[in-house]
Amino acid sequence: MLALLMRWFFTIFLTGIIVEGAVSFRNEVLPVLTRQGCNAGTCHGSPSGKGGFALSLFAFDAAADHRVLTKDFLSRRIDVLDPHLSLLLRKPSNDLSHRGGLKLPKDSREYRILHDWISDGCPIDSPATPACVGIEIQTNGPSVLHWPQPTAKLRIMASFADGAKRDVTHLVQFSSSDEAIATVQPNGTVKGVRRGLSAVMVRYL
């Protein structure tokens, strides 16, 4: 029997905070941008940004990112009165020309998160809200995948300082260290391609 050896690796970025009952800028909005690659070094996270729009690399400076999104460019990136008209949504949804292509389909959960945050008035998290203290990777199967169905589904749970736990699978960025051996989809589905060892990294802000 041909077996595909998999090892779950993950990276966690802490200091996230959460606002109960509202979309969290730090724990939801910024992870959406990271998940889509918007603040990567090859995109708006580069030192010079892209197209006059610069974000901190992998959201390391939440306050600066909030200012860039809501204040810079004459506040044109955000339209609180009609969120659908915000450049932050129109560009990645391909409603307007976007060099990065389609990133946020209008029917996606990520689009709705950004829309609701804008609709709420673009709040930034209160320093008093609970911090993210860790994440846990859960899987519906073993870390050794066997043919003829070499697949597994990952679920990512975040823990907060107040004891709360939340499923953040839809907010994390997955990547495989060797896609010739295994691939990982945005929903956490890992699929073996051929025999070997590959690491899966999970990034959550």
Where on the chain are the PLM-derived regions?
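Aromatic- and Gly/Pro-enriched helix-to-coil junctions and flexible linker segments
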Residues: I17-L205
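Bacterial N-terminal signal peptides
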Residues: L5-I17
